């Protein structure tokens, strides 16, 4: 069953068709070169140094070329590799890199601004670009470059050769991951969500199709056009049992540039001055009334038409873990309206075809906490990843060293040859750092 998503939802929503990997890019190339390419002003397009990309050859190449100002003509499109609700993604490489064995491959997302303006979705493309500029994390994309070409807006990011977790799951026995594999991928997604929430970003579109697999087997979340970027900052919660200390402090408003500094400063104060308090990287005051997401993954508060906040990501995380382990989502049904009704009214249940091991019982307990229909009681809604990480399902897993673990599967590094009319390729070969705190 195809999952309908990637947009502000209605029961008639459908995904844009994805063409075969060998589709020619020549028509787009012609359109782009009919008008002189415009570039983003230097102060806006300058790529600030990203510490997590310090050993990334592809990132270094982009930064070297960036000094002269990048345009569409600096890239060679190879083939179309995906399409979504707001854009089309092409595999590409830097023009002039004739030795393919030494070339870095990239993914270029191309947005037709005129088409989006007609559909009144241009704000989604702008939101994604804004968020990408904020990110510097091993499990999240880095914005390598951005530029305009005629009425197209282009962003260049890392190319993930391993596809996505949805496709990878379908290649597993019985189309589901082992518990240990599911735990590995869930842990990396959890760390990525923690970082996003620390920045005040509610993802709102977590699903296996949006979790890409890098060439080293580790994951990368993608597609941020449905995300909510709030001014809410992380809260401080007391570990004391007194009612007044268990209240979350109401965060003040800060500019986006000052937000991260305030979090770091506050976390240091928590550690040094108030040892009984816990730093919570969770935008607990962020709210939205938008009806967005993927039907099988939306939380009950969204399905019922109410407002929502950070808790929707923890619901989606529970649905994701359920699907990874059992091969289907917990409230799946033949039609979208029945799916939404199930999400609101039907009780969570688990397969009973075989006895559950203790490891699986831990997984079920975690999923049950995440899929609490009351967002105020949902696991993660108040203290975020901090309370999810300590669940017995993740016992023995060192989150700070997760990138040193060998992933369940490491994809082939082979990139298919482009067609004659194609252009571009790029892929990073960065080695992971020893550890990460976010």
UniProtKB/Swiss-Prot annotation:
Compositionally biased spans, kind Polar residues: 11-24
GO MF term set: ATP binding; kinase activity; protein kinase activity; protein serine kinase activity; protein serine/threonine kinase activity
Effect on the protein of changing residue 380 to R: In pid-2; intermediate pid phenotype
Positions bound to ATP: 81-89, 109
One Pfam entry name: Pkinase
Membership in a protein family: Belongs to the protein kinase superfamily. Ser/Thr protein kinase family.
GO BP term (any one): auxin-activated signaling pathway
Tissue occurrence: Expressed in root hair cells, shoot xylem parenchyma cells and endodermis around the vasculature. Expressed in anther primordia, vasculature of the growing flower stalk, young pedicels and bracts and developing sepals, but not in petals. In pistils, transiently expressed in the vasculature of the style and the septum, and in the integuments and funiculus of the developing ovule.
Species of the source: Arabidopsis thaliana (Mouse-ear cress)
Name assigned to this protein: Protein kinase PINOID
Top-level taxonomy: Eukaryota, Viridiplantae, Streptophyta, Embryophyta, Tracheophyta
Residues passing through the membrane, by range: none
